Each structure stands twice: as C-alpha cells, then as structure tokens.
C-alpha cells in the first residue's frame, strides 16, 4: 500500500497484476504510457513522435479498439504533464467530428450577423492561444475524422500547412470574417479577420472505416503520415511485456523536443533531401528505384513526398538508437507511399506485385509461399513492414477484386 501523498508521475500501472506500483520519473514517453495502463509498442510511439515532428499532421487508422484515440490523447497529456486542468484545456482540443460538417465552421466557428459577434469554437480558441505562446506546443485531436468529408471541412488547414516556405514560414492565413473589429461571443476578446495556423499546433486525426464514413482522397493522404493500428498480440498483452524492439529513441524524454529548435522548421524542403543524401547517399538509389517502378503506372509520388520522407530520415538519424536507413525507409514507405493505393485488380495487381518484389534485396518469385512469409513479417525482406502490408493488400485483391491500404 502506498502511504501519504504520491504524485501521479511516481506511479505506474502493472498490467499483469492490474495494480498500480511505484515507478521512477515519468519523463520517459514509454514509461508514461505504461503508467496510464495502455499497451503500445515502443516502435509505434517512436513513429508517432517522429511523424508529428516531421509534419504536424498525422492520421491514425486501424481496427476499432486498438487505442488510436488514446495514443494521441496520452501523448498530448505527456507533453503537458504538470499543468493545471485549466491550462491543459487551453493546450489540448479534443474534437468529435460531426457527419453534417460541410465546411470549416465546425472547426473555426462563424460570424453571426444577428448579434454581430463571432461564435468561437474550441479549436479557434486554441489557435488564438497558440499564436500568443509560440514556445508551447498545442494539440488538436480530430476523433473519427472521416465521419465527414475531410476535403470539405479541413481543406483550408491542409492548404495553409502546405503554403509554408523558408521565406514565409507562417504560410498563408485563414479567412475568418470581414466585419472589422469583432468580439467573440464568449466574451474572451476580439477575433481577427485573418489568422495564421501557428507552427506550434499539432493535428492528429483518427479514422474508422465502415458504412457511415468516407474514404480519404489521395490529396489528403499525400499530406500526412498515416500510421496503422492492426497488430494485436495477446501473449505480450497478457504478460505486459514487449518483444525486443529496434526502432526506439536514444533519449525517451521528448517533452521538450517536439517544437522545432532554433535551426529547424515544421515543414519540409529540398534541403531535407540534400541533408538525407549527405547522411547516407544510398537514399537516392532507394527512392529512384521506387519512383521508376511506380512511374510505369502513373502511381509515382512528387517532390513533397521526397522532401517529407527525407525530413523523417533526418529526424530518425538524430533521435533513434542504432539508426538503420532501410528500417527508416521501410516505415516511410508504409506511412507515406502505400496509403494512397486503392483500386481494382486490373489497376493494382501488377504494381503491387512489383512493389512487394522491391521489398526484397534479391530477385524473388511472387507466389503463395512468398506472400505467406511476407504476411507473417518476413525478416529476410529488406522492407518487412511494407512487404507485410502489401501481402495483405494483394490477398484482398485476389479474394475481393479490390484493395485499399485503409481498411
């Protein structure tokens, strides 16, 4: 029994015994999730952190009940730990997307001509607050993001994030109203006519796929890292212990590492590609070979993806223990290249088979035996994560005549 007053940061949840026990500091991100009683692989948490740091928009997809929403909520709480409930409320906006959203009013509010005031939303209040405190990270979590068409209510945000450049890092501005001096309906001050999305705001959208949701367009998927949650390991879950993992952070205390440093930016550019090539010239050949495969089917990617993959590689090189280029590229193929693939057997059968062959170093024959090995995570592949997903997509193509990365 724990006596006296104990800080939450000194407690940790033991999933095997279903008890709370004493732990060390909750500075480390992996320990913090454990203390909350949630089981996520270290690789998954590392990928989420690096994805946010590479670009402040991440999509989490996968089967229901795997913790997509919780990984985003707990990460935001981890960064904001030690703050009062009121302060956390200003820094974190949890938004349940409504199926009737046809424009950005659900996120940004609107000017009401009747009372001549601006009706402010939680997200707009957070954006205004973040603009006043650029040294603090803020989080917007869009739960069930695809209950409405993302292109309709979130397109302004996507366009503005893409408009950031070296000479204009703030990007273009959101249009809010044209009514001059306008007070907020909640009485908390003025609302400007135009507002830049602060670079210290991080967006995460969770996705479920059923008959009530919409699929994403390539335009949306091209602008995010997509992390899939489908792996459920009951044996590890029961023991509360993970298998040895390789993609882990050098320093798991990332509370002050999310915001860009003095020489960093929250957008990608050609400089990231140049920096990645300096770190490992092999990245050119890997990406060029991949482009040559996909170009045959007009499924190739553009310079934005090249820059963002390179940015992720540079971040991983700086922060991941025992950096391995093939491992990092495997993760980026899985998160940046494959999510846009969906279509019929006639469209995707040949390119998907060529892609899974690309995931192996040596020349391979694509048959049922290889697909079975790849589906079980084949360590002989140079890109085993991507090969595993491709094997599933090819199987769906053969059985259903149609496949999609997001399922």
Task: Indicate where each model-derived feature is located.
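AAA+ P-loop NTPase catalytic core and its hallmark functional loops
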Residues: 4-257
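Alpha-helical lid/collar subdomain of P-loop NTPases
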Residues: 6-16, 22-23, 242-407
């Amino acid at each position: 029994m724990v006596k006296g007053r104990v800080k939450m940061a000194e407690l940790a949840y033991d999933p095997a015994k279903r008890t709370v026990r004493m732990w060390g500091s909750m500075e480390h991100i992996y320990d913090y999730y454990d203390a909350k009683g949630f089981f996520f692989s270290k690789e998954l948490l590392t990928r989420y952190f690096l994805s946010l740091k590479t670009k402040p928009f991440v999509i989490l997809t996968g089967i229901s009940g795997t913790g997509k929403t919780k990984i985003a909520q707990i990460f935001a709480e981890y960064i904001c730990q030690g703050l009062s409930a009121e302060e956390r409320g200003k820094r974190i906006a949890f938004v349940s997307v409504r199926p009737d959203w046809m424009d950005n009013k659900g996120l940004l509010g609107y000017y009401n001509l009747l009372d001549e005031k601006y009706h402010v939303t939680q997200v707009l209040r957070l954006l205004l607050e973040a603009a006043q405190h650029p040294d603090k990270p803020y989080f917007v979590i869009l739960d069930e993001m695809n209950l409405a068409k993302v292109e309709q209510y979130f397109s302004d945000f996507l366009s503005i994030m893409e408009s950031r450049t070296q000479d204009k890092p703030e990007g273009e501005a959101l249009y809010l109203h044209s009514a001059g001096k306008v007070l907020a309906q909640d009485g908390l001050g003025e609302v400007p006519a135009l507002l830049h999305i602060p670079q210290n705001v991080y967006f995460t959208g969770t996705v479920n796929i059923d008959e009530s949701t919409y699929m994403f367009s390539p335009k949306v998927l091209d602008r995010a890292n997509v992390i899939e949650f489908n792996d459920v390991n009951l044996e590890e879950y029961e023991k509360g212990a993970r298998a040895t993992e390789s993609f882990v952070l050098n320093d798991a205390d990332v509370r002050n590492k999310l915001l860009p440093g003095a020489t960093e930016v929250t957008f990608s550019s050609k400089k990231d590609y140049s920096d990645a090539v300096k770190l490992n010239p092999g990245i050119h050949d890997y990406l060029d070979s991949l482009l040559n495969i996909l170009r045959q089917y007009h499924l190739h990617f553009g310079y934005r993806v090249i820059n963002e993959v390179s940015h992720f590689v540079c971040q991983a090189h700086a922060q991941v223990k025992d950096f391995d280029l093939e491992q990092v590229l495997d993760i980026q193929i899985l998160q940046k290249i494959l999510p846009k693939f969906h279509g019929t057997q006639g469209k995707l059968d040949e390119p998907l088979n060529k892609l899974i062959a690309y995931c192996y170093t040596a020349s391979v024959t694509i048959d049922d035996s290889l697909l079975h090995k790849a589906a079980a995570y084949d360590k002989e592949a140079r890109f085993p994560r991507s090969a595993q997903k491709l094997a599933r997509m090819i199987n769906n193509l053969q059985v259903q005549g149609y496949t999609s990365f997001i399922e």
